[in-house]
Amino acid sequence: MPVKNWMTTDVVSVGPDTSLLKVGKLMKDHHIRRIPVVDEQGQVIGIISDRDVRDASPSKATTLDMYEMHYLLAELKAKNIMTAKPITVKPTDTVEQAALIMLDNKVGGLPVVDEAGKLVGIISDHDVFKAMVDITGARLGGLQFAVELPDQPGTARPLFDLLRTHNARILSVLTVTNADGNRHMFVRVRDLENAQSEQELIAGVNKLGKVLYCQH
């Protein structure tokens, strides 16, 4: 799944000399949590999160009056609070790669740049969640079950043969390999004839491996 299929392309960005006051307003007006900072050529030079804005803003306990606070927010620039040289991804990178980068670096979004380093989009944890929902077929309903099978070539074939026998339409298949030499297969299907057909299917799956759960 390439990032380009899931990223936001209509990206709100700012220049390095944009005031903190304007950055905060843009976040509020567009309901976003991060804004890339770009130079005159459109290349990404930084990123600002809503936390950066909060940390740089005067606290409620400040002794500054309203005019002093407004002056401070107007004078503080994006370049003063941004994270410089942020981690970026390419449109051709996968969503899985982007998710791993976000997880490992504890960030909620990544600018997407082309080969010249110019901003072409942004992908967030929210976009990753949407991709996951689509991959798993969660919106399509049906029956989902998980089965534990040996992590060996050919062990999944009897399962697919069984699904074919019951005329089950496969919506998604995900696998996770465990350290104990087994793998968990998460399968979502639909178009089974009735409840009895579902019960017969799960009984057959249980003969192939250990059924971990089954639910609609």
Regions found by a protein language model. Name each.
Residues 183-192:
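Short basic, glycine-rich beta-strand/loop surfaces that mediate nucleic-acid
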Residues 177-184, 215-216:
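Short proline/glycine- and acidic-rich turn/helix-capping motifs at secondary-structure junctions
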Residues 1-52, 57:
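Basic, Lys/Arg-rich alpha-helical nucleic-acid-recognition elements, primarily the DNA-binding modules
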Residues 1-10, 50-87, 94, 99-103, ...:
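Tandem CBS (Bateman) regulatory domains
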Residues 206-216:
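Short, charged, intrinsically disordered terminal tails
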Residues 33, 108, 169:
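Short acidic/polar active-site loop segments enriched in Thr and Asp
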Residues 27, 35-52, 102, 110-126, ...:
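A glycine-centered beta-loop-beta connector
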